[in-house]
Amino acid sequence: MISLCSDWEFTREWSAGFAHGEGRFPLVDLPHTAGEVPLHYAKPEDYAGICGYRRGLSVPLEYRGKRLFLQFDGAAHFAEVYLNGEKLAEHACGYTAFRVEITSAVRYGMENRLAVRLDTTENPAVPPFGFVLDYLAYGGLYREVWLDVRGADVIEDVFVTTPTLTRAEIALTVSGSGARRRVTLLDAAGAVCAMAEGDDNKYYVNYSNARPWSLDEPNLYSICAELLDASGAVTDEKTVRFGFRTAEFRRGGFYLNGERVFLRGLNRHQCYPYMGYAAPEALQREDARILKEELCCTAVRTSHYPQSRHFIDACDELGLLVFTELPGWQHIGDAAWKRRSVENVREMVTQYRNHPSIILWGVRINESLDDDDFYRETNALAHSLDPSRQTSGVRYLEKSHLLEDVYAYNDFS
C-alpha cells in the first residue's frame, strides 16, 4: 500500500468550499490530532469540533483497469470522505479502520483532491458517546491513511485459524471473476514452508515443523494468498501474519497451547499528553514493550476500544496476550446506536482476527446494564466471524446476565 500520511492541509473550521479546494491552510502529517491538548485543564473545545483534512492525490494512467481503495486506519469520530468535491463515503467509528473504493471517481493522469470532513465531537448517535465517558475521546486523522492499488479481481480478506499446532486453515474472501488461487505458508525469514493451489476459497496447510506461538517464543508465520490468471501470472495478492497456537479459557483457567498460563495484566488507553490519540508507531510499540518487559505483564486489555495495529503487532512479536473490546463505557443508546455498535464488532473482529496475541473478544459495553437481545447479537456475530476465539464483556454488577463465554468483572472492593 502507498502511504498518504504527508502534506495534508488542515483546518479546524470546516466549510463546504474546503472539499472543492477553496483557501489555503497549514500542512500537517499523519498521525495528527485535531487539537493540541494541554497537560492540565483541557476543555472540550480544545480538542473537539468539525475540522477538515485535504491533500492532492496523483493517480498515474497505468492504474487504469485496476481497483483503487483508500484505507483510513483511524478517523475520530465521524468521517465523510470527498474526492474532487464528491462525497463518496462516511464512517461512524473512531476506533476501527475503513476502506473507500475510488476506482470510478478518480481522474487518471491528473491531480485529484482528497478531503475528509471530520466531526470530532461527542456525537450521541455514535458509540461510545451518548453519556459521560471516563476517558477523553480525542479527534483527528490519528492513524495512517493509505492508497491500495489492486487487480481487477481482489482478495478482500484472508482469515487464518490454527485448530492444532501444526495445521493452518485459510479462508479467502475474493471479489471478481473466477481466478485461480494459491496460498503459501512462509516462515519469519520468508522461506516457503508449504503451498496449496486450487479454485476454492478454503485451504488447509499442514506443517509438522511449525514452531508454536507462545509468551516466551512468539514465533510468527505468514500466509501469502495470490490470484492467478490463465497463464499463471499473479494478478492480486494479500499477505497476513499469524501464529500457530491454541487458546482457551476453561473452568480451571486460561490455557495457551494446552498449558495453563497465569494472566497478569493492565488496562491500556491509547492517549498521550499534548498529542491525544496521535501517537506514532514507535510510541505504540514502546507501550507494548513496557508492559511486557518492564511491568512483567502477560496480558493487556485495550480499554475501551480497538487500538492501533502497531500496538497489536508489537504484542504479537513480544508474546503479550490481548483482550480487545468494542467501543463503549456504561451507556447503551437507541436502536440505531446499537446497530452501529454491532457494526463496530464486525469491524473489530474482521480487522484483528489474524493476530495470535488476541485471545478474547469483548462484545459487551464496559460496565453496562443488561440488554440481552443486544448482547445475544454481538456474541453471535463475533462467533460467526471467528469461531476460534471466545467472547467476554466486563461488568461491575455481580448478578448481571452472562451471555458471553468468559465471565469478566471489575472488582472495586
Give a label for each model feature.
Residues 88-89, 193, 261:
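Short hydrophobic beta-strand segments in globular cytosolic domains
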Residues 2, 8-15, 44, 48-154, ...:
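Accessory beta-strand-rich segments of carbohydrate-active enzymes
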Residues 158-161, 212, 224-293, 313:
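N-terminal carbohydrate-binding accessory modules
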Residues 299-413:
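Substrate-binding/catalytic cleft of secreted carbohydrate-active enzymes
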Residues 85, 145, 221, 258, ...:
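Conserved, mostly hydrophobic/aromatic
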Residues 151-177:
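Surface beta-strand/loop "capping" patches
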Residues 1-37, 117:
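Accessory carbohydrate-binding/adhesion or oligomerization-edge regions at the termini
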Residues 107-111, 175-250:
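Extended acidic/polar, glycine-enriched regions
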